[in-house]
Curated annotation (Swiss-Prot):
ATP binds at G136, T137, S138, G139, K140, T141, T142. Gene3D superfamilies: Mur ligase, C-terminal domain, Mur-like, catalytic domain, MurE/MurF, N-terminal domain. Its main location: cytoplasm. This is UDP-N-acetylmuramoyl-L-alanyl-D-glutamate--2,6-diaminopimelate ligase. Meso-2,6-diaminopimelate binds at R408, D432, N433, P434, R435, G490, E494.
Amino acid sequence: MCADTPHHPTPVHTEEAMAITLGELARTIGGELFNAPDQDLEIHNIGLDSSTLAKKAPIFAAVPGSRKHGAEFADTDRAAGALAVLTDRDGATILDRKGDTRPRLIVDDVREVLGVASSSVYGDPSRDLVLIGVTGTSGKTTTSYLLERGLMEAGYKVGLIGTTGTRIDGEPVPTKLTTPEAPTLQKLFYRMRQHGVTHVVMEVSSHALSLGRVSGSHFNVAAFTNLSQDHLDFHDTMEEYFDAKALFFRAGSPLAADHQVVCIDDEWGTRMAEVAGNAQTVATTGKRADFTAGLVTVKETGEQSFTVTVPDHGEVPVTLALPGAFNVANATLALAAAVRAGVDPVAFARGMAQVAVPGRMERIDEGQDFLAVVDYAHKPAAVAAVLDTLRTQIDGRLGVVIGAGGDRDATKRAPMGELSARRADLVIVTDDNPRSEVPATIRAAVMEGARRGAAEADHEVEVREIGDRAEAIRALIEWAGPGDGIVVAGKGHEVGQLIAGVTHHFDDREQVREALRHTQSDGEGK
């Protein structure tokens, strides 16, 4: 175990809410108070809107929005019980116009201080937790699940925050974002601490790093999975995307974790390790690294076993129910992060053995004679990795249903179609979450790439366009025969399809099961 192993905090079980005075909060964030004759006013909660303001003594954080300034909603938050307002000078002008005379705390940029302010209101809870953050383009959710289960097997009480939701010691807690806004996040840390949680595993998105959602959080370990094209609607270039992730690792960054582990299987990982300076490295492709995976064996079911060479421990055996070389990388990274957090690697590895992640290489089995999988892959590199993995598990043909999300990075649409057609025998282009865009426009971009990939592929490829996602799934399953493999890619664990501002219930897993049963019943009747 490393000499600089983080401490394991003593669980706190008090139910008394934390509090900070308005004057203390102003001094902490460097703000200026107005209309505040009583600087000893106690603040117990902080929120960005009325729905997140708790009943006891909250302060409303009014930030500029894409359409309106948050201060325009001051009447709503006042009705919710907000005793004071944290805002900028534009917000103060709006409050004056509305005749709002509550105490106000003025700063130049609310988002810049919101993380520290929220942490202060809830008593800096992350410092009483061993906090492990996972970032990267793909693999965050799977790595986080592996960490959660491994830590639980090692005897710790664990919190999880990520794409598929939040859990406190295994119990679900509703959240909306991969990385919640700073007030919600700090309150979650506070709740976890109250419930005796010792370790928290958290997915950290590039948006969260860029927008300051994790400011004020003390991370013991940061883990980097990989980087590939995504979010170029938010980050203008891959370099900007990389720089956002690097905030978590770069020496001198206020967001940098105490310890870092970086997978160097791709060039971006190698660069990230260089940026971090003192990061420990992970490799599964034969590169020299601190943690290396080897002796990989794969069963017909996709179950994998391998060893990880761990500094000061030697080789640790690992078994995974999850298929794919990328999951060997995810598991090795999870193990490395756990070791950096002072966890016994052997006990941790036992916990990873039976991890299943909703919508990630999730097999759907209704007794059919071909392999059917649902996966969240919605980025070019992820789609390619999933198809490459499935190709190794089947003797027959490979088919995929693929689409792309609206109001998101449009430059990845054609590459997703192209990479699919280079690997699959059948590509069905369909709708994902069109959001406010015209679905046919999105499909056209994916189709362009698919046709190009089919023309350049070293095998015959059929490309179809079926806009209705349920119909596309049925067509894929009707096409599949004995020994084939199919994957419905893009939505994974999601249970809704967002079209023109309306979310319709839609679960790829349900649709695949229904189509499989329907196809089998038709076959039995023949």
